Amino acid sequence: MNPGRTSARNASLFLLLALLSFAAWSDSAATAAGEAIFRQGVLPTGEPLQGMRGSEAGLEGAAAACFNCHRRSGLGASEGRIVIPPITGKYLYRPDRSKPEDLDFRYVQGYRLNREPYPDDASVARAIREGIGKDGRELNYLMPRFDLDDASMASLLAYLRGLSKEVAPGVTADTLHFATIITPDADPVKRQAMLAVLERFFADKNDFIRGGAKPIQSSREIVYRVTRRWQLHVWDLAGAPETWGAQLKKRLAEEPVFAVISGLGGRTWEPVHRFCQDEAVPCLFPNVDLPVVEETDFYPMYFSKGVWLEVELIAARLDEQKRQAGLRRVVQVFREDDIGEAAATALNRWAEDAGLQTVRRVVRGPGGSPLAAAVGDLHAGDALVLWLHKADVALLPAKAPDNAVVYLSGLMGGLESTPLPAAWRPVTHMAHPVDLPEQRRFRMNFPLGWLKVKQLPVTAERVQADTYLVCGILSEALGDMLDSFLRDYLEERLEDMLSRRVITGYYPRLGLGRGQRFASKGSYMVRFADPTGTRLLAEGDWTIP
């Protein structure tokens, strides 16, 4: 063996590896720079992106970011009569429509089969800088003209080439994989009720497509056919919340899923929320009364802010009471290690900022004695706020406070079925972040009728109705997507279609604007009409705090 030749060969190999590593790093850096332009409106220099629309005032920074119109997926949208086309590399540079390789293009909003492809990077750059299309005609005035140097343009085009390029994990030729996540402290009755709805809905979907129709092969097919089975994976968590993230990442690696549907939580959902956002997995409308309020997060979606919405509603009432009736002190009662503690902490912050005295009384131990002590010793000018579940509401003393206004969490207490003692009913105002029973009755005919037909007992009505609702929402959104199974696109379709739904279950209306992640935004404040029964009286209109 020639040592000199071996050394030269090793040096050449080292140089090749170094060059490949540098090329990969360079491509990655360019893509990251392009992403910053696309999503944030920030140039590689750190300066804000500049865009102009004719004689109008210019756009700058985040307001000029491409995703504002073309969406996070880059697949475009439709705004009234304005069609915003997809701008991912797949659609910008697509093969000629007359060639066989064009047959596997999937339908997305804004995509026209007769749209000519851009022949090269220079033509795309001209459209971005000058607003001149590939046919030489001026683009719609809504398309800004962007001031990008060559390096910035190259980074943006590199990002667009890779954007929404691959089908998402959890999608195979014949199956869509979904997970539902259940925390270890979740109510077992609600768990069984939720899973029964999910399993039956999935079975119905799969029965509908039984027979083995093949996946769509061409966007030229006239009729859309649902062809993929739905596979449900149940991810039961164990142990302390700080271990849930690692458990979920392990499950996702073992069982890749397209999205997480429904789910059931207890005292905290924070680790699940963080997992969904960090792993870019849509997590759709779990059954949790203490969701995570991070409006800038993209992937988790919720029906309501839950008890956080109740905090806002009660705070508004307390503010009114302070101005009109001399409120001086807010006394809050909650059970140890329950979601009421977080709600009480949030309301405490508001009360202290408002200059009110605050008292927190923690219920510990079984029986009615600890609770009776917690709701005693009240004075004129006090407001008593109860963050209690049904079992504790039932243990309230028979005699209500004589000299305090009482507020109750409806979500925790059980809404109209809360076992509030008769003497408490006239003096208690209950936050009610769902529609009134008589007003939701017609809409509830759909989920309740489905449960009856499927011979599923009603054991946790709100959980079952919300689970049925999210199944229907997901089915409708996937129908709109055809074969474009991309996670970001799923979120965007949900934003666009949710406000059009007639079947909204417990909620008077649902809707998600761009970037919004709570579909129902309002609440009633109610009181009971009678010493017994479930009839409620609204103390005003549906209110969005």
Give, region by region, the residue ranges found by the protein language model:
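Detector for the c-type heme attachment site
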Residues: R39-V42, N68-L75, L92, R129-G133, ...
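C-terminal capping alpha-helices of c-type cytochrome domains
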Residues: D27, A33, Y118-K134, P144-P169
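Electrostatic cytochrome c docking/interface patches
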Residues: A24-E60
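Beta-alpha junction/loop-to-helix N-cap segments that form part of ligand/metal-binding clefts
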Residues: A173-T175, V189-A196, F208-E295, R364-G368, ...
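Extracytoplasmic ligand/sensor domains, especially the bilobed periplasmic-binding protein
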Residues: E254-R361, A404-M430
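Gly/Gly-Pro-rich "capping" loops immediately C-terminal to redox-active cysteine motifs
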Residues: G51-D121, L142-L148
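Extracellular/periplasmic periplasmic-binding protein-like sensory domains
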Residues: P300-S304, P397-L469, E539-I544
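Segments of small-molecule ligand-sensing domains
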Residues: W450-A465, S475-L537
